[in-house]
Amino acid sequence: MNKFSLFISENFLVVILLLSLISILIIYERRKGGKKVDTAEMTRLINKENPFVYDLRSAAEFSAGSVSGASNIQPSSLVKGDALFKANENDCIVLICKTGTTSAKSAGDLKKQGYTNVNVLSGGITNWTQSGLPLVKN
Protein backbone atom coordinates (compact mmCIF):
# COMPACT_ATOMS: atom_id res chain seq x y z
CA MET A 1 0.00 0.00 0.00
CA ASN A 2 2.89 2.31 0.75
CA LYS A 3 4.30 1.90 -2.77
CA PHE A 4 0.91 2.65 -4.26
CA SER A 5 0.56 5.88 -2.29
CA LEU A 6 4.07 6.88 -3.27
CA PHE A 7 3.32 6.20 -6.94
CA ILE A 8 0.12 8.28 -6.78
CA SER A 9 1.85 11.21 -5.11
CA GLU A 10 4.79 11.16 -7.55
CA ASN A 11 2.54 10.83 -10.61
CA PHE A 12 -0.43 12.89 -9.48
CA LEU A 13 -0.94 14.69 -12.79
CA VAL A 14 -0.77 11.46 -14.79
CA VAL A 15 -3.30 9.79 -12.50
CA ILE A 16 -5.68 12.78 -12.72
CA LEU A 17 -5.34 12.81 -16.51
CA LEU A 18 -6.03 9.08 -16.73
CA LEU A 19 -9.11 9.31 -14.49
CA SER A 20 -10.38 12.28 -16.51
CA LEU A 21 -10.01 10.38 -19.78
CA ILE A 22 -11.83 7.36 -18.37
CA SER A 23 -14.67 9.59 -17.15
CA ILE A 24 -14.96 11.31 -20.54
CA LEU A 25 -15.05 7.94 -22.30
CA ILE A 26 -17.82 6.67 -20.02
CA ILE A 27 -19.90 9.82 -20.54
CA TYR A 28 -19.36 9.67 -24.31
CA GLU A 29 -20.45 6.03 -24.50
CA ARG A 30 -23.60 6.69 -22.48
CA ARG A 31 -24.63 9.60 -24.70
CA LYS A 32 -23.70 7.85 -27.91
CA GLY A 33 -26.83 5.87 -28.47
CA GLY A 34 -29.86 4.13 -27.14
CA LYS A 35 -30.14 1.50 -24.51
CA LYS A 36 -28.27 -1.67 -25.45
CA VAL A 37 -30.46 -4.74 -25.10
CA ASP A 38 -29.44 -8.38 -25.23
CA THR A 39 -31.35 -11.03 -27.16
CA ALA A 40 -33.54 -11.96 -24.18
CA GLU A 41 -34.59 -8.34 -23.63
CA MET A 42 -35.14 -7.92 -27.36
CA THR A 43 -37.46 -10.93 -27.37
CA ARG A 44 -39.34 -9.48 -24.40
CA LEU A 45 -39.69 -6.12 -26.14
CA ILE A 46 -41.05 -7.76 -29.29
CA ASN A 47 -43.56 -9.83 -27.32
CA LYS A 48 -44.71 -7.16 -24.85
CA GLU A 49 -44.00 -3.66 -26.19
CA ASN A 50 -44.85 -4.03 -29.91
CA PRO A 51 -41.82 -1.95 -30.93
CA PHE A 52 -40.88 -0.53 -34.29
CA VAL A 53 -38.00 -2.83 -35.27
CA TYR A 54 -35.71 -1.37 -37.92
CA ASP A 55 -33.00 -3.44 -39.60
CA LEU A 56 -30.33 -1.05 -40.87
CA ARG A 57 -28.41 -3.56 -42.98
CA SER A 58 -28.39 -3.60 -46.77
CA ALA A 59 -31.46 -4.84 -48.67
CA ALA A 60 -29.57 -8.00 -49.69
CA GLU A 61 -28.59 -8.82 -46.09
CA PHE A 62 -32.14 -8.09 -44.93
CA SER A 63 -33.62 -10.37 -47.62
CA ALA A 64 -31.35 -13.21 -46.52
CA GLY A 65 -32.96 -13.10 -43.08
CA SER A 66 -33.94 -10.77 -40.28
CA VAL A 67 -35.88 -10.64 -37.04
CA SER A 68 -39.60 -11.29 -37.49
CA GLY A 69 -41.53 -8.05 -37.95
CA ALA A 70 -38.48 -5.93 -38.76
CA SER A 71 -38.55 -3.31 -41.51
CA ASN A 72 -35.50 -2.64 -43.64
CA ILE A 73 -34.48 1.01 -43.63
CA GLN A 74 -31.25 2.86 -44.28
CA PRO A 75 -29.82 4.97 -41.44
CA SER A 76 -30.27 8.12 -43.53
CA SER A 77 -34.05 7.53 -43.51
CA LEU A 78 -34.29 7.58 -39.70
CA VAL A 79 -35.70 11.09 -39.64
CA LYS A 80 -39.07 12.55 -38.73
CA GLY A 81 -41.33 12.74 -41.74
CA ASP A 82 -39.57 10.08 -43.83
CA ALA A 83 -42.20 7.80 -45.39
CA LEU A 84 -40.33 4.65 -44.28
CA PHE A 85 -39.83 5.79 -40.69
CA LYS A 86 -43.19 5.52 -38.92
CA ALA A 87 -42.24 5.80 -35.24
CA ASN A 88 -43.29 8.71 -33.03
CA GLU A 89 -41.02 10.26 -30.39
CA ASN A 90 -42.37 8.14 -27.50
CA ASP A 91 -42.72 4.83 -29.36
CA CYS A 92 -40.49 1.89 -28.51
CA ILE A 93 -37.86 1.59 -31.26
CA VAL A 94 -35.34 -1.23 -31.70
CA LEU A 95 -32.47 -0.84 -34.15
CA ILE A 96 -30.60 -3.81 -35.62
CA CYS A 97 -27.48 -3.90 -37.76
CA LYS A 98 -24.79 -6.50 -38.34
CA THR A 99 -22.77 -5.96 -35.14
CA GLY A 100 -24.46 -3.12 -33.24
CA THR A 101 -22.12 -0.32 -34.30
CA THR A 102 -24.29 1.32 -36.96
CA SER A 103 -27.34 0.95 -34.71
CA ALA A 104 -25.60 2.73 -31.82
CA LYS A 105 -24.68 5.70 -34.01
CA SER A 106 -28.20 5.85 -35.48
CA ALA A 107 -29.71 5.63 -31.99
CA GLY A 108 -27.69 8.68 -31.01
CA ASP A 109 -29.05 10.52 -34.05
CA LEU A 110 -32.62 9.58 -33.07
CA LYS A 111 -32.07 10.77 -29.50
CA LYS A 112 -30.90 14.13 -30.86
CA GLN A 113 -34.21 14.32 -32.75
CA GLY A 114 -36.15 13.83 -29.50
CA TYR A 115 -36.90 10.09 -29.58
CA THR A 116 -36.88 8.80 -26.01
CA ASN A 117 -37.30 5.01 -26.15
CA VAL A 118 -34.54 3.87 -28.51
CA ASN A 119 -32.99 0.43 -28.07
CA VAL A 120 -30.05 -1.19 -29.85
CA LEU A 121 -29.62 -4.95 -30.19
CA SER A 122 -26.23 -5.53 -28.57
CA GLY A 123 -24.00 -7.44 -30.98
CA GLY A 124 -26.50 -6.97 -33.79
CA ILE A 125 -27.92 -9.71 -35.95
CA THR A 126 -24.67 -11.63 -35.46
CA ASN A 127 -25.44 -11.98 -31.75
CA TRP A 128 -29.06 -12.88 -32.54
CA THR A 129 -28.08 -15.78 -34.81
CA GLN A 130 -25.27 -16.96 -32.50
CA SER A 131 -27.88 -17.19 -29.75
CA GLY A 132 -29.82 -19.64 -31.92
CA LEU A 133 -32.77 -17.32 -32.49
CA PRO A 134 -34.73 -17.56 -35.73
CA LEU A 135 -34.52 -15.35 -38.79
CA VAL A 136 -37.33 -14.74 -41.26
CA LYS A 137 -36.48 -14.49 -44.96
CA ASN A 138 -37.96 -11.38 -46.52
Identify the function of each model-found stretch:
Residues M1-A40, L45-P51, A59-C92, K98-N138:
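Rhodanese-like catalytic fold shared by cysteine-dependent sulfurtransferases
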Residues Y54:
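Active-site flanking residues adjacent to catalytic metal/cofactor-binding acidic residues
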